[in-house]
Amino acid sequence: MAGTTPPDNPYIAARNEWNERYGSYVKAAAAWRIVGITGMTMAVIGFGYALYQSTQVKLIPYIVEVDKLGTAVNAGFPQQIEYADPRVVRATLGSFVSNFRSVTPDAVVQKQYIDRTYGLLRTSDPATEKVNAWFRSNSPFEKAKTATVAIEVNNIVALSNQSYQVDWTEFERDRRGKETATRRFRGIATVTLTPPQDEGVIRLNPIGLYLRDFDWTAQL
């Protein structure tokens, strides 16, 4: 008796035909989805890294020294220069003393003096603690209620590459402008150069000169 072939299942036949026609498209679509997800992930990682790098930008000043005719004779980044031009150091120290010791009735200007003073100080150095102690017991805002103090820097002498002697005179006047006292002081400042790391620091301390230590005494 001859064998009989069972009739084809129409559902199986339809599925096979669908697989043959569209299965490759489904696989290709799945592959492209994987590629798309991978690309998006890499884009997110790249954007995150770029954003992180943007927050790490450091502004480093480039110092150029010129002679009397304006010709450049030395240049470089602060970390490449062992010590700044002594004239620049002396001018910076003179400004520091004036900002530190001046007393004015204008509270806005007084705050600027204090900001400029701390622009040359670092929290870890002894000079900062000494200046803090002075301001704690000698508030310039309280002093300004009854008097003003003007500073005249008389002399700044280099004792070494890192230490300077500063002599100055303080003229105290009452609020009517009458001079009530004149005092002379001498300070010894030990300085160091550290490259500024952001724009805010550069505005207050463009060459990165910091006072590591600072002592001062009244002179007879």
Curated annotation (Swiss-Prot):
It is a single-pass membrane protein. Its main location: membrane. One of its GO terms (cellular component) is plasma membrane. The keyword Transmembrane helix applies. The chain crosses the membrane at residues 28-52. It is found in: Cell membrane. It holds the Pfam family VirB8. The keyword Cytoplasm does not apply. InterPro entries: NTF2-like_dom_sf, TrbF, VirB8. Keywords: Cell membrane, Conjugation, Membrane, Plasmid, Transmembrane, Transmembrane helix. Belongs to the TrbF family. This is Conjugal transfer protein TrbF. It comes from Rhizobium radiobacter (Agrobacterium tumefaciens). The lineage of its organism: Bacteria, Pseudomonadati, Pseudomonadota, Alphaproteobacteria, Hyphomicrobiales.
